Amino acid sequence: MNPGQDREKIVNIEERIPKIKEQRKQKANRRLISFIMLFFIMVLIIVYLQTPISKVSTISVTGNENVSKKEIIDLSDINSGDTEFWSLDKQKTEKKIQQNKLVKKAEISKSLPNKINIAIEEYKAIAYLEKDDVYYEVLENGSVLPNEVTPDDAGPILVNWTNAKKRSQMAKQLDALSNSLKQSISEIYYTPVKMDENRIKLYMNDGYVVTASIKTFADRMKTYPSIISQLSSNKKGIIHLEVATYFEEFGKNDKAAKKEDEN
């Protein structure tokens, strides 16, 4: 090997040693800085968790009308100044609130630094229940609100609906109708017979009477506008929608006695 080449290699290595030392020093410094930053972040987290700012400070409730703010907060188990803000399980808490039969949906959102908002969607009123000449709102899931009300044109009046299960089924069927069709119904009587526990009778605002079954009511009732458009306006009667659809004109005594079998 050429002695001159050996000397060049030795010189090159000696020149690189300071650079290697500097690179190692910089790498060590970066590690130290990263460790210090991580240490301070952990300290800040520990301090944060030990201070009141890590707890829920404010709870707001929106969208509720029939369920009080206090009742919703009680159901949520969220306690201001006690519940951990970051560890709050939103889905679990929403399910707790939705145990209330008037609440259709609950949605929880968080906003910094420690505020909680509970957005409520309640079941809407779709009918009125008549009981001892007093009226109560019926919700789309069949629940009945406790306060007395005066009926308007928002929905039909339900009569003889003491069976809660059947009332709930009827409410779901009504909810499937358009608003205009619901508003065309004056009263709905629950009129079960031995062979058909789902039989109902409707008195329409246009003078017609409809007989139907709870289970098929929504689908069959959607054909009502088409049916009456084919009937003479001066001939009223009963439109049967249980099995086969057909029209039966009132007899002479039907109009006077048409509600006697329900009362």
UniProtKB/Swiss-Prot annotation:
Main location, first listed in the record: membrane
Result for mutant: P225A: Does not affect septal localization
Ranges in the topological domain labelled Cytoplasmic: 1-32
An individual GO BP term: sporulation resulting in formation of a cellular spore
Subcellular location: Cell membrane
Stretches in topological domain Extracellular: 54-263
Transmembrane segments: 33-53
Domain of life: Bacteria
Signal peptide: none
A single cellular component GO annotation: cell division site
Gamma: region residues: 229-263
Pfam families: FtsQ_DivIB_C, POTRA_1
Membrane topology recorded in Swiss-Prot or TrEMBL: Single-pass type II membrane protein
Protein name: Cell division protein DivIB
Gene: divIB
